[in-house]
Each structure stands twice: as C-alpha cells, then as structure tokens.
Amino acid sequence: MRIVVVSGGFDPIHSGHIAYFKAARSHGDKLVIALNSDAWLENKKGKAFMPFHERKIIIENLSFVDEVIDFEDDDHGSCIKGLEKIKSMYPNEEIIFANGGDRNK
C-alpha cells in the first residue's frame, strides 16, 4: 500500500487545503493528515486561530482523508521525528511525504 502523508497546521482549514488534500490523495492508496498542535501554531505564529480538536473534526470528515494524527515539527520546521512516527505505524508500507506550501515560514 502507498500511504501519502501531508502535514501542517491548516489553521484555519480552507478550500486551498482541501484541493491540496485531494491532489495528494491521488498519489496513493491512503491519505494521512499529520496535524500540528495548538502549541506548535502558537510557537510559529503567536496563536492558534482554530483549536486543534475543531481542525481535526473538520479534516476527519472529508471523505478522501483516511486518517488524521497529531504531529509535531521541531523548532526548525523539521518533521523527521514525526515522519519516523508514521513509518513506525506503517512499517511495511511505502510512505510518500507530499508537502508544499509555507514550509519555510
């Protein structure tokens, strides 16, 4: 199975994110959204606009999203530890990290 992973804060979730999720899903058999916490967003931009649990509920209810997990990038924006977590969840599957957007902000 090919698992596509997209990570981010998605705060607030908007139509561009939804189009992005759909495009990412087309590259695999399963789409996992790795959602950053409120604390991570506060560190990145000073506050979270939409609480984690609300963002998670909205994203979980998109028909093309298979799973939403909590996810933390480090202080430098690296998501290596988070991707290692996902690989440990799916040790025998191909993982595709399909990120774009504001990774350098």
Segments (PLM) and residue ranges:
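Nucleotidyltransferase catalytic core that binds NTPs
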Residues: 1-105
